[in-house]
Amino acid sequence: MVIYQLFVRVFGATEKKKCGSLNDINDAVVKRLVELGVTHVWLTGVIRHSNYKDTNPLVTKGLAGSPYAITDYYDIDPDIADDKEQRMAEFESAVGRLHDAGLKVIIDFVPNHLAREYKSRCKPHSEPDFGENDNAGVTFSPDNNFYYCPGEPLQLPISSEGVHYHEFPAKASGNNVFSPSPSVNDWYDTVKLNYGIDFRDGSKHFDTVPDTWCKMLNVLKFWCSKNVDGFRVDMAEMVPVEFWQWVITELKKHSKITMIAEIYQPDMYRSYLDAGFDFLYDKVGFYNTLESIFRYGGSASRITDIWKSLNGLDDKMLRFLENHDEVRIASRHFMGDARNGFPYMALAALMSRGPLMIYNGQEFGEKAEGASGFSGDDGRTSIFDYVFMPSLQVENQENYKDIYLFYKNLLTFKQSHEAIRSGAFYDLMWANPWYSNFDPQYVYAFIRYCKDERLLIVINFNLHDVKDVRVTIPDDAVRLLGGCEGEYRVVVNPGEYKVVEI
């Protein structure tokens, strides 16, 4: 599985067209994604969310607003439609074009929080809105959708002359801040949803299915009816695992849906997989280790610790070097050049059977240079404001052709080799120590194999020096492979990888 995160608002934006649209995902774009080796497209920012035109600026981050401050779970964001009255039809058409090309479609599901000014225009008439039937006079009730600070008004951390925002009583903020006075670093533009846990004492009230559970099941069923193939679940770990056990079971009775959890607590991995998630973010182990190796000169041998720490869950982890939350590889805040990320990307693509994700513009070395509104100059493509990606502009793509070809060759290689798609993994680092004719400081070697294919993969993380190494294949591996040479000489150029059939 190769996922392409496509942030619709930014993907089709240009210097003259401030906001991209669903219609920008045209036949030519779809063809390019297929040729790139993509299997799934994660359409980001499609659900209606806060923006400066429709919501109070005091509870809106940036001009375009955060795509994770949802104002209507049942609507498409009008910004990304060429004909706003036909926005759902435009979404359905985009999904149809992707499906016609054999691509699967993933969208965000944001279950932990919603925008302070949430009001559904498009929900089923029979269903009460979130908070509509709440008792706002109590801090917690399992029948409420929100948490409240009874008798206390909301005090926002920002102000603007002549602009006022009134909320009484104050609701808890999305990042579990149960206070009427969230800080500027809190998710003050959002409200925490109540799944039946009283955070004052941690008690769980699940004997009767909480109202929020039922509302969220209906939201998911609605988008399944629009033929989406999966959900990337925002901050899944902030919603109780008991809900996921219940809702995913209900969903999968009717749909073959893929569920991907954004999760950052390794001790919770297995319970969320047991609850029905198909894949989990591998930020804490994989991404953080590779970032540390690049920034601080850590040894490539540390990569072994990644899969060991997962205790057999390696193939369930979604690997990435970029997404909307992370600093761009090519940014001066990180690697400074997309090419410096090539060996790290090769590892992400080839190490396991699990899914791989790239972020729009990554395949052209997008740098995200300069300040962009709310998020400032942080090396990320802003999710809060109207920006465009220079590298993705047609007139500039030729300048980044070598980067694009690297990604295309890597992703198509991943998809076309059974040993990579579904084969087993054997780490060779234990058999190639420091004192041998090997360099575990900069070189990582492993085998991917299946019945009909055996591949030795050697990656050189040194960006300056050629590595001429002798890779020992231990007797144990030779037996697993059904016989092969006990040693291979491999020469790998700086920042590259080499695949040897053995």
PLM regions: where:
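The substrate-binding groove and active-site-proximal loops of carbohydrate-active enzymes
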Residues: 7-23, 69-88, 189-212, 229-238, ...
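Glycan-processing catalytic domains of CAZymes
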Residues: 22-37, 47, 56, 63, ...
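N-terminal structural segment of carbohydrate-active enzymes
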Residues: 1-104, 112-114, 119-123, 127-135, ...
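C-terminal beta-strand-rich structural cap/linker in extracellular carbohydrate-active enzymes
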Residues: 486-502
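Active-site-proximal helices and loops of the catalytic beta/alpha 8
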Residues: 148, 154, 218-317, 365-413, ...
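Hydrophobic faces of well-ordered beta-strands that scaffold small-molecule active sites
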Residues: 2-4, 41-43, 105-107, 231, ...
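Aromatic- and acidic-residue-enriched segments that line the glycan-binding/catalytic groove
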Residues: 51-70, 111-185, 274-282, 371-383
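Carbohydrate-binding surface patches
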Residues: 432-474
